[in-house]
Amino acid sequence: MKNLTIVADSNIASLDEFFNPIALGQNTEQQVQVIRVAGRDINAQLLADLQPDVLLIRSVTQIDQALLANNNSVKFVGSATIGTDHVDQDYLAERNITFANATGCSKHSVAQYVVSAILTLRPQYWAQSMTPLTLGIIGLGNIGSTLAQYASDLGWQVLGYDPLLATSDINNASLEQVLCQSDIVSLHVPLTDKKDTDTQGAMSISNNFSDYPTRHLINAETLARMSPHTMLINSARGPVIDAAALEADIDATERQVVLDVFEHEPQIAESLLSKLAIATPHIAGYTLEGKLRGTQIIYDALCEKLAVLPVLSMHQLLPLNTYLWSELKENPDRLLKFYDIKKDDTALRNKITSGQVKGSDFDQLRRDYHLRREWQA
């Protein structure tokens, strides 16, 4: 076997630990070269020049024919993310390129972020004597279903909507019911477009198509169905919400809105940011456990591709965690010790210059983010 060349997004956790000759089962005469590149700098010319065997990415890198047309060496693409809207999987299949993504890697991280945001803005919902909060969840995959479990633990009622799944205890409502009857609506859907979408002139078309498209799922019409008192949280994909419609809605209703993702990310307009109750730089999934789990999953998949047994587990790299959900949910005063979401909000707002947060500053906040811990369920 020839030496293995890997081009990797430099923001993927623990690259050195997982992607070295010993961890990948290579013999001592073979080398594993890991070339670290900022995710937005992985381009067609770079891949044509380097001709890597393996490409490890995050959601900021678009994988499609335009990127790989002049590369004939890549045999494996791994995305250390849950979402796949940045990857043209049909094209990879045509090229016989193996693809793996980190399904479920950050489900606890994101769900815990949402709970933290809710209880920071509406701490009264800690009280069991309160009328139970009704939490609407749109999208009941790995993250949405995990959030539903935490909500149940807190005694909250869940209204869930996912047209792609069978009816269940949590998939129990229509979109209309979720919008109209919830105290808080949290979005956990992939970014998808109509199957007949005309991509000509589209600013940012996804690589996913669906009978239930989610681009601008939250728009002027759907916002109008929601009570002004209903909080809206988006930690899924920015373009799921029409940003212009959202600004107009907040102006009219003073709605509490929490955004971790933005339609025109990585640039964020101050006009939107100033209206949000909480805004963070796409870090809902940024826990030590979530990041390591993402790396672990694509490492395991690459080992399978190379026909070697994985020899490293993320648990070998994790320090002791003292945050237990069983204790935290009974002691609300520990919430800020676990995660002060307002610090991340302040850090993002402090980057406003000339009426916006620049893309480079947004990316820097993500790159330099001090990974928090998940609480142990």
From Swiss-Prot:
Keyword NAD in record: yes
Primary subcellular site in the record, as a coarse category: cytoplasm
Enzyme Commission code: 1.1.1.290
GO cellular component: cytoplasm
Location(s) in or outside the cell: Cytoplasm
Positions of NAD(+) binding: 162, 260, 285
GO biological process: pyridoxine biosynthetic process
Enzyme class: oxidoreductase
Oxidoreductase keyword on record: yes
Amino-acid positions noted as binding substrate in the UniProt annotation, renumbered to this chain: 59, 81, 286
SUPFAM superfamilies found in the cross-reference section: Formate/glycerate dehydrogenase catalytic domain-like, NAD(P)-binding Rossmann-fold domains
UniProt keyword annotations, A-Z: Cytoplasm, NAD, Oxidoreductase, Pyridoxine biosynthesis
Assembly and interaction partners: Homodimer.
Its biological purpose: Catalyzes the oxidation of erythronate-4-phosphate to 3-hydroxy-2-oxo-4-phosphonooxybutanoate.
Family: Belongs to the D-isomer specific 2-hydroxyacid dehydrogenase family. PdxB subfamily.
Protein name: Erythronate-4-phosphate dehydrogenase
The gene coding this protein: pdxB
